[in-house]
Amino acid sequence: MVFYFTCSDPRYTMYMGRDKHENEHLIAHGWPEDLWFHVDGHSSAHVYLRLPKGESIKDVPEAVVQECSQLTKANSIEGCKLANVKIIYTMWSNLRKAAGMADGQVGYHDRRAVMHTVVEHRNNATGNR
């Protein structure tokens, strides 16, 4: 089951898969307007932010990026225990699924289009939704 979350900015919808099977479903059925978040180097939920049509990754307010990043960190078994976690994010259209990849595993069409941020401390109000 995919989980939907209300974003602090009403223009956006956040949704998430909690395991590799849900993540695989989201990879297969994403929209071009989706921004994908994941903990770098650790297993985690795939968090998606649905952008309004015509908006790009550069238009997303930093507060919204941090909100999605907190949700991503909170839903990583390893990442939620770490003080500093690197969160990577890119547009769904940049995700590449190659034959032989495990469920939930992705690559990128253009690694330069992958952005990152660091979550230093967990925000329980955001993470415990």
Short names for language-model regions:
Residues 49-65:
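Short histidine-centered catalytic/ligand-binding loop motif
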Residues 42-50:
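Glycine-rich, often proline-containing surface loops adjacent to acidic residues and nearby aromatics
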Residues 64-129:
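Helix-rich interaction surfaces within compact, conserved domain-sized segments
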Residues 22-24, 46, 54-56, 96-98:
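Eukaryotic short linear interaction motifs
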Residues 1-31, 61:
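Long beta-strand-rich cores associated with HINT superfamily self-processing modules
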Residues 8-10, 41, 81:
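Short flexible coil/turn linkers enriched for glycine and charged/polar residues
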Residues 4-6, 15-17, 38, 48, ...:
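Residues in well-ordered beta-strands of folded domains
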Residues 36-42:
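Short glycine/proline-enriched loop/turn "hinge" motifs that connect secondary-structure elements
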